[in-house]
Each structure stands twice: as C-alpha cells, then as structure tokens.
Amino acid sequence: KDTLESIKDIKEIDEIIVVDDGSSDKTSEVAKSVKSDKINVITQSQNRGKGYALNNGLKEAMKKADIIGFLDGDLGNTASEVEKLITPIINNECDVTIAKFPPAKKKGGLGFVKNLAKESVKEMTGVELTSTLSGQRIFKKEVLEIFDEIPFGYGVEVGMTIDILKNNFKIEEVLVNMTHSETGRDLKGFIHRGKQFYHIKKVVRQKKKEWR
C-alpha cells in the first residue's frame, strides 16, 4: 500500500498496473483501497510465479504506454525514487534505466550470485553493470517489443539485460535511495540464492546458444 501511495501522484505516471498473482497477502484488496484513478488491478486465480505475473502486466501496459516500468511491491515509501529512473528516459539519455540500490544494511549472501550475474553479462556483451539483478527498471516501449515474452524464473533480469545490450540499446544504472526486504543469511536466504544461481546459469547457457 505504501508503495502505491508513494507513486500515485507522480505526474509522469499515467497508469499503475498491479498484478495480484493469486497470493495470500490480499494484493487486490490493498490496491483497490488506494484512492487513485491510475490504478488498474489484474487478478490471477493462481500463483504462477514472477515471470508469468510480469508478462500479464506487460501485455496490458503495452496497449497504450510509450514508457513502461517494473517495480516490486515491497519498496514502500521509497518507491517515489522511481522518478530518478524515469527522467533519463524522458530526456532520451538512454533506452533502459536500472535502479542501483545503496549497500544492503544486513549481511546477505556471499556475493556469488551477484558476481555470476555481473560476469555473465560482461562476458557476453562487454558491458559491466553492477545492478544486473535489480528488478526495478524503466524501459522505452521499443525495447520491450524485442521480447515475445519475459523469460520466466529467477534469471529474468540477467537474460533480459543480455538481450537488450545485444540489440544495441543503451542501459544506464541510476543510484536511488530505495529499500526493500533483503534476503538474509538464514536457510531460506541460502535456498533463495541457490535457486537464483541455478536459474542464472540456465538462462546464460540458453543465451550463449541464441547469440552464437
């Protein structure tokens, strides 16, 4: 709710699409309780993962928007920082912006997932980005038109980044003061990172075949 409240009055934003992926946290009800004509809620009957939700929201957004962004729902009040990501696109400085977060407050993983993502993108494109795993991104519509659909799984961001750079679009990382729930060093955190690692490896293997 805080995320929606903090972006609904940003003048550059015409529509906010919320995808309720059949989760148990009452996403639809929360979204509908926010007073704004900009909010459009899409409800899925069952949870089919992040990639599926992104594709659903994207289909809707592509109908009328020139600039499209992805934001996680847990950014809270810091979501208003999205303005910093929108401005370079409007000013035609680049085709895609990626949010670069301040250093994490709590000790997360051992950085191996981040490094794998960073090195994979660099190896395939020659471009070094530090926030390859950040899902907070703004795109010009023509960038998203190169995708039939967004790749599924935790490798989403890495796969997209490789394709975007290979198609000669320009990506700019923008430092933002956003915060969201971080993955800690507990078992759940390690399982999450293990899955990420596996998915990134899989996506990169796939991209190497595609871009031979």
PLM regions: where:
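Residue-level preference for short helical/loop micro-motifs built around acidic side chains
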Residues: 1, 25-29, 52, 131
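Residues at the starts of beta-strands that form the adenosine-phosphate
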Residues: 14-15, 67, 170
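Conserved donor nucleotide-binding strand/loop of the catalytic core
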Residues: 14-17, 28-60
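Short beta-strand-to-loop acidic/aromatic patch adjacent to the donor-nucleotide binding site
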Residues: 65-76
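Hydrophobic helical membrane-anchoring modules
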Residues: 150-212
